[in-house]
């Protein structure tokens, strides 16, 4: 068998030496370790991403819950304000009606008082007129003594009836 020292042989020897050097320097182990480290790093990044995603979902759920609570509280506040406005309106209406009723009653009372005063004035004027007429008639028809008695009786009767 004859060895040929041609280019193919030297390429083969170079390849074998390269592979031996690669194995001697533990390049496959380093590559495996590097790939394992990279895989661990990717796994950690995926776990971190998953944790961040879960945290984001938790925060989203919490903010949605807080938003719903705030909306419910706002609706409650609006309803309370509407109820209070209705109560204030009803109270103002009631007070206005009471004021009008009081004013009406006061006006009616003043009218009745004015009517009573007018009636009293008319009666007083009628009594004065009747007394004057009676005096005139009695003065023409009766003597002084009878006039004096009649006048005294009439005055006392008028006083008792008016008071």
Swiss-Prot record:
Membrane-spanning ranges: 5-25
For this UniProt record, the keywords arranged alphabetically read as follows: ATP synthesis, Cell inner membrane, Cell membrane, CF(0), Hydrogen ion transport, Ion transport, Membrane, Transmembrane, Transmembrane helix, Transport
Q: Name one GO molecular function term.
A: proton-transporting ATPase activity, rotational mechanism
Extract the InterPro entries matched here.
ATP_synth_b/b'su_bac/chlpt, ATP_synthase_B_chain
Identify the main location.
membrane
The way this protein sits in the membrane is described as: Single-pass membrane protein
Q: Provide the Gene Ontology terms for cellular component.
A: plasma membrane; proton-transporting ATP synthase complex
- State the compartments where it is located: Cell inner membrane
Cite the PANTHER family for this sequence.
Answer: ATP SYNTHASE SUBUNIT B (PTHR33445:SF1), ATP SYNTHASE SUBUNIT B', CHLOROPLASTIC (PTHR33445)
Give the family per the record.
Answer: Belongs to the ATPase B chain family.
Function, as annotated, reads: F(1)F(0) ATP synthase produces ATP from ADP in the presence of a proton or sodium gradient. F-type ATPases consist of two structural domains, F(1) containing the extramembraneous catalytic core and F(0) containing the membrane proton channel, linked together by a central stalk and a peripheral stalk. During catalysis, ATP synthesis in the catalytic domain of F(1) is coupled via a rotary mechanism of the central stalk subunits to proton translocation. Component of the F(0) channel, it forms part of the peripheral stalk, linking F(1) to F(0).
Subunit structure as annotated in this protein's UniProt entry: F-type ATPases have 2 components, F(1) - the catalytic core - and F(0) - the membrane proton channel. F(1) has five subunits: alpha(3), beta(3), gamma(1), delta(1), epsilon(1). F(0) has three main subunits: a(1), b(2) and c(10-14). The alpha and beta chains form an alternating ring which encloses part of the gamma chain. F(1) is attached to F(0) by a central stalk formed by the gamma and epsilon chains, while a peripheral stalk is formed by the delta and b chains.
Q: What is this protein identified as?
A: ATP synthase subunit b 1
Query: Organism, per UniProt?
Result: Rhizobium etli (strain CIAT 652)
